[in-house]
Amino acid sequence: MKKVYILALTSGLLTFSCSDKLAPLKKDAIAPTVVTQPLPHDTDDPAIWIHPTDATKSVIIGTDKDTDGGLYMYDLKGTILKKSIVLQRPNNVDIAYGLKVGESTIDIAVTTERETNKIRVFAMPNLEPIDNGGIPVF
């Protein structure tokens, strides 16, 4: 009987302690200037590709980190412009400028695909895959 009371007490405490998952917002908190459109799953670690001649054409690349996730391209107002091919748990994304490919020079977005253990490479600013399905790394 004692175990039943302990179980009931523990359940009650857990229920009440988890009822509000967000910390209260302070009155003097700084509000974001722009918020991107929401994605279905966990998102973080954005990268910004800066257009070489017109900064207003720069884009934000963010990850949707679930099994059916991908890279998302946003304009500077936070509107989704494009989604990459489906990636299996993409992780962080980074931008590199001036990669020599044959006679061309391109900018790239690079992410890891955790479920396939591959590096994925996309040409910028079109977010097109250029890695023939990924580069195995593990």
Where are these regions (language model features)?
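Sec-dependent N-terminal signal peptides
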Residues: V4-L13
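Short coil turn/linker residues within repeat-based beta-strand modules
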Residues: T67, D75-I80, N126-E128
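Blade/loop signatures of beta-propeller domains
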Residues: K21-A31
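Asp-box/WD-like beta-propeller blade repeats and closely related beta-sheet repeat scaffolds
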Residues: E115-F138
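Blade-loop segments of beta-propeller domains
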Residues: L76-N117
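Beta-strand-rich domains and repeat architectures in extracellular enzymes and scaffolds
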Residues: T33-G69, N91
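C-terminal motif of bacterial Sec signal peptides marking the signal peptidase cleavage site
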Residues: T15-S17
